[in-house]
Amino acid sequence: MMQVNSQKYAVVDLEATGAHAMAEIIQVGIVIIENDQIVKTYQTDVNPHEALTEHIIHLTGITDEQLAKAPDFSKVAQEIYHLISDCVFVAHNVKFDANLLAEKLFLEGYELRTPLVDTVELSQVFYPTLEKYTLGHLADVLQLDLTDAHTAISDAYATAQLLLKLKEKMESLPKELLEQLLPFSDNLLFETGMLVEESFKKAKVMSKKDYQEVGGLILRRAKAIGSERKLSDDFELNMALLGLDAREKQSRFAQMVKDDFQSSKISFLEAQAGLGKTYGYLLPLLQLAQDEQIIVSVPTKILQDQIMANEAKKIQEVFNISCQSIKGPGNYIKLDSFAETLHREGDNRLVNRYKMQLLVWLTETLTGDLDEIRQKQRFEVYFEQIKHDGNLSEKSLYKDVDFWNRTYENAKHSKLLIINHAYFLERVQDDKAFAAKKILVFDEAQKLILNLEQFSRRRVNVTQLVQKLEKHLDAALPTLEKRLIESLSFQLSHLATRFYQNQEIYVTAEDAYRVERAAKELFALNPEWRYLCLEGLLSLFAQPFTDFWFETSFENEKRQTYLNASSDELLNFQEFLPETRKTYMVSATLHISPQVSLADLLGFEQYHYMSIERDKQTSQRIWIDEEMPNVAEISDEAYADAIAERIYQIRQLDEQMLVLFNSKKAMFDVSERLDAVELHHLTQEKNGTAYNVKRRFERGESHILLGTGAFWEGVDFVQSDKMIEVITRLPFENPKDLFVQKISNHLLAQAKSPFNDYSLPLAILKLKQAIGRTMRRENQRSAVLLLDPRILTKSYGKIISDALSEEFYISHQKFSKSLTEIKNFLL
């Protein structure tokens, strides 16, 4: 074996006939780095003596004709071996490239025994907050040269640049941090940890201006904000100072916010999505506010993070205005708990890699918000152990730098505070002063209805509770205590079995009482059970709930069963609000129907409503399939066949396709049919959670994604330039749903029609939101195919069609003609 030069790297990328062990190499790209300089490149095609699949041809652009002229691997093996045998072997996913190349070289008589370094794992550790670690995504974020992705030399060159960026970043980190990482670096694949050791030798000691060491952890120091700059009363000028152009309707929206500021009534402002509403309300309010704090509430933590990373960050940089985001304590890292895990032995390789990732992250984060770690869902058990519980000992080494405490205190004094709807409801329930005398903005205010409903519910994970109870049966407990554990476990398991076997979703008052009695008897015998596992169940029965039901979900590929409870009446949002300086409700849809508005459902009688007219979309169109059969008139099997056949034909257009379902059963039925014809696709729950299948879809693993639930209104497709969205059915709510029944009863009491005044307009709203999932930025083009014939045949269909026509161009015709038009539209 040749002597390896630890300062010389061979960065290798292979293209092959597949991703399996029996694959043949079809292209080799090698970049040699010496003394942190690219000194040589090498590339060659290789004749595999077998035809390529359509997938590989599409992915790489390599053709059979091209490879027919290429040399056999035996003709290039010696040159490749001598080029890389004295180097450290580096690749992005090194296991595949190194194993495949070593095997092919071995068959030609060359034994490759070089150290192996994986840039995927290095990137995960040293760029801890990225959403993805594909070479393409890293190239976008780090501005690597990847002009011809999935050709071997282009990928190898980009990986070489990535390696140099990684080395530069590692060597810039405090020497004390790298010393902390060294004991964990053996958990990295193969010899990847050697780069941590090399960087440690070159790194400098910690700069006390930028970092502080507390209790053995290296933390980033927060920098003081300069004096606040006063905003102009000219919206366009403020936008220009931010380096942005104000749009005409955005300026009008900002003027509406300004004009209504002195009104004592709550302002309901309606404006089309994509208008730039966030700057439209932030800039005028920051200019008008004197000493009042501005609180902006959004529906999700994701949107909260987006505002902090974009609009709030820019405003803070330009105007030196203090901006703070706050969530519940469980979103933040507890440094005491994390530090304890660093000394824990026996954790697996990937958990130890996450510890490295978090140690690096602590030198970057100013918030300690674990949502900054985008891939933590893979190890939720570990992250549960290190998240904050809201409590902090006075003796804690980290008392003065605790992220949750710091965030809580900063939130009291910041000029602009960003929260989410759920946090607002939880907070003001016990602390009205939190929002009193302040300026409130509820963005996407229509989501407050559902947030109120979720707030009025409690849920308990029955699967986990039964597992914990049965685990304690093995302990040495008194006989009576064991009998009570068995009784509670039996009651819960019995109800869950009826739910799965007989579809008994709802729990009777008698059954709920039996569970409550069993839980309270166990608690009365031994109060320790509250803290062992009964906290959630006892809290659920402590509320005046009248409705109980079961739900199931898949989490980390495992089925979880939940017992839910709620009251039978809608909560009145107005009762939550303290007396504020000013409150705005902002949404793209405030009027649900001519008879029902969002203000009505939230309990407001006195309010001021203003709106801006909508523009029609030109880069998104809707086609309605005239030939699609009505599901009510055919069997489930025939319905699934009809959808699958259309998906198969649309796939010939070679564009990304999102297919939305109302029913999980229909989604799985269609998936089975696509499997039968070997049409590769991804299906929510079958192939992972909504988050995971979306990530795989955007990574290019498949051109077809079947989804339901979150894909209707909570998942955006920003990265796709062109997309086809297939909506299989109109999204009417299930009339048996308890929340829908509450709304119906509320409207009937006011002599209004639950269908015409709520279910129908809500379906239109949900339909518009679904259509908007694939149209989230300029320069996107999206074709929407609606497969529900009720829009053409039912009396309410014209109402839906007219509502969509306000914003979109619509045509209805035979499927074959729609397919041709969609193809031309997306060119």
Region annotations inferred by a language model:
Residues 234, 292, 301-414:
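A substrate-engagement module of RecA-like helicase motors
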Residues 262-283:
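Walker A/P-loop
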Residues 88-95, 99-104, 134-196, 784-786:
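Acidic, Mg2+-coordinating catalytic module of metal-dependent nucleases/exonucleases
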Residues 1-4, 165-235:
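Acidic two-metal-ion nuclease catalytic site recognized across multiple nuclease folds
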Residues 391-412, 431, 522-634, 708:
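A contiguous, basic/glycine-rich beta-loop/short-helix subdomain that forms a polymer-engagement track
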Residues 627-635, 689-788:
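Conserved RecA-like P-loop NTPase helicase motor core
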Residues 390-416, 421-526, 590-602, 736:
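Signature of the SF2 helicase/ATPase Hel1-core->accessory helical subdomain module
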Residues 2-114, 128, 132-146, 150:
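Conserved non-catalytic scaffold segment of RNase H-like nuclease domains
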